[in-house]
């Protein structure tokens, strides 16, 4: 009897973990798709937006190059 209950508890915990992981993956997939869609739509305008925002906020992209 105890073995059957422990087996049932293990199966329920696995299904709950799988269910929560599935919900997490669904939310993550939806978020990534939204960001990829946004990136695709802004592929032309992003450099202009970046330049305007960096000028407004006085932020510069700094690249450090070392030549040995």
UniProtKB/Swiss-Prot annotation:
Disulfide bridges in this chain: none
Organ and tissue specificity: Expressed specifically in salivary glands (at protein level).
Listed Pfam families: DUF4560
InterPro entries: SMIM10
UniProt name for this protein: Small integral membrane protein 10-like protein 3
Organism per entry: Mus musculus (Mouse)
């Amino acid at each position: 009897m105890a073995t059957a209950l422990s087996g049932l508890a293990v199966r329920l915990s696995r299904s709950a973990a799988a269910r929560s992981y599935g919900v997490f993956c669904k939310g993550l997939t939806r978020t990534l798709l939204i960001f990829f869609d946004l990136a695709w739509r802004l592929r032309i305008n992003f450099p202009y937006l970046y330049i305007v925002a960096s000028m407004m906020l006085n932020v510069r992209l700094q690249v450090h190059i070392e030549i040995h």
